[in-house]
Amino acid sequence: MSSAEITIIKRDGKRKGFSVEKIKNAIRKAFLSVGAFATEEDLVNILSHVRITEGMHVEEIQNQVEIGLMAEQYFAVAKSFMLYRQRHSEDREVRDHLDFLIQYCQAENAATGSKYDANANIEKKNLATLIGELPKKNFIRLNRRILTDRLKKMYGKELSDKYIRLLKNHHIYKNDETSLANYCASITMYPWLLEGTKPIGGNSIGPTNLKSFCGGFINLVFMVSSMLSGACATPEFLMYMNHFIGKEYGKDYWKNPDFQADNSIKKRTIDKIITDCFEQIVYSINQPTGARNFQAVFWNISYYDKHYFESIFGEFRFPDGSAPDWDGLSWLQKRFMKWFNAERLKTPLTFPVETMALLTENNEVKDKEWGDFTAEMYSEGHSFFTYMSDNADSLASCCRLRNEIQDNGFSYTLGAGGVSTGSKSVLTINLNRCIQYAVKNGRDYMTYLAEVIDLVHKVQLAYDENLKSLQAQGMLPLFDAGFINIGRQYLTVGINGLVEAAEFLGIEINDNPQYVEFVQNTLGLIEEYNKKYRTKTTLFNCEMIPAENVGVKHAKWDREDGYAVPRDCYNSYFYIVEDKSLNIIDKMRLHGRKYIEHLTGGSALHLNLEEHLSKAQYAQLLRVAAQEGCNYFTFNIPNTICNKCGHISKHYLRECPECHSTDIDYLTRIIGYMKRVSNFSMARQEEAARRFYHRDR
């Protein structure tokens, strides 16, 4: 192949025909810059050290020119050539930043403008959000250097280079490379009760009354979230709040909530005092914060039926020796849900993301009271997740590690798994590209997947070592203070493109033996490696990641490289989100025990409905979920927000019911959390428009 026929890859990723004259001119300029002249013989000798191959990057060619200059002992010329490259590299970086600044300012919204990790959890783009975006490219470089240095020490340069190659070829994706922080955590707040925020860099003591609990809790969530790149879950939140209400108004306060307990001019009842506390906490935490690039913290809470409560908190004692009171907590959980549901008619509140934990027995919700209340809240238009299990200790055992030889562990990286657990790092496998790559190259795709999965585990172990190194140097106070137990944190193997990979293989995406076999074999292989690399202090899980950002990226990158891509955003479910042929029960079955058996890190089913169902219908769907083993789900009905008068309706409408304006927006779940559709990136807005919503007929 002649040099004229070879194509090389430029810095912007585009291919261009190779020109030897451009290389010669660059060398001539380098000679002239030091007062010398390059003869044709000089050029031939220098270029004899350069080997050009198809698809080579321009940077590699320039590296070889440097080597050629040094080999021929033109040291001054080589130095000049290197400095020239460095200056131009700096100029390009500044130019890239300027181009990004202009594009970001002109973008439809912050999510569309973000180049690296678009998310809808930003209401409006502004200077603060721009400042947060600009350094992300450098954070990616730094994170890759830190990780590859560790990989070289642990496994050698070959594996380190392979990791970068798989990253750049989009076979794998490192989530949250733009942050140095570990991913998410479901914290225990017990250290806060004992020592306040002092152990993590604050200056406050622990809460002593209801007011200090509310203010201190807000500060705690902000502080913890600033040290995480993902979600912060506080599963003890309402239990602690119930404790402080009881200390102030008596353990049985909930029996007489209308009692006037405020002697101020407001004359507030106990109920009003409590809902004022709700308001203070929820509205404060929903505000954007500078430590999170001017977005709200991603805050999650849990509700429990009596059986889950007794399993997780049965032996819990507050510092004063008292046990948590279930009766008061049960009332407070219901009161918070009712209040939060009503409050969302006033303003589109995103957080907390709520998860209801229910125990099942004989394919029924065991706690009838809480099963009925769950159905009631869904029927009243409230939007929350439900986690169901036929073993109350299964959630407590694996997430709190009471039983360290447990084969399987459940922990969802949105932070809904339990107390003092979470995910340290997420590394995602693009199943669609990996499988198509193997098939196109005549390889058994399961064998190739095994290679990728093995590498992913080694990379995660390298990340874990770096995290331990940071902790040893005092950089992770959340671990040192006991808010998070590093031994209970998971290294998460994410998956994306599973449905698209199955489609490529000619498998129908519905409940059929071929699809079951494909899912079980693929996810079972990951679980096999999770168990292989697991130790008493190092845990792995597998999650079908929400993929708000990377689902769009994978589809774009794979299509550009000639792979079969059936849609513009890869699914985060076991079914095709726009498929109209599947009913609600079909989707629950596709997220049931046959499919999620090996998915220990979560796969939240979002059941998109056009309208709310009745309490009886939701109760029946809870039974169906229990029968099918569909353990994690929510119902998603878009709420209508009028841009003209501000009215919010829990219904999916085409015009405002108050002023009849058609200038409306919708509040729906982009992935795990609810935001205005107008806050979604443009790609995700297009995906949202393709979703199929079931109608109650």
Sequence positions of predicted segments:
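Contiguous, well-ordered alpha-helical segments that form the cores/surfaces of helical PPI scaffolds
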Residues: 239, 491-504, 524, 669
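Short, hydrophobic beta-strand segments
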Residues: 6, 48-52, 314, 500-507, ...
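Long, highly charged low-complexity segments enriched in Glu/Asp and Lys/Arg with interspersed Ser/Thr
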Residues: 77, 81-84, 630-638, 682-697
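Charged, amphipathic alpha-helical regulatory modules used
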Residues: 1-110, 485, 689-693
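Long, charge-rich boundary regions
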Residues: 658-697
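Metallocofactor- and cofactor-centric catalytic cores in central/energy metabolism, strongly enriched
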Residues: 272-275, 504, 689-692
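Conserved catalytic cores of very large enzyme subunits
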Residues: 98-487, 508, 512-666
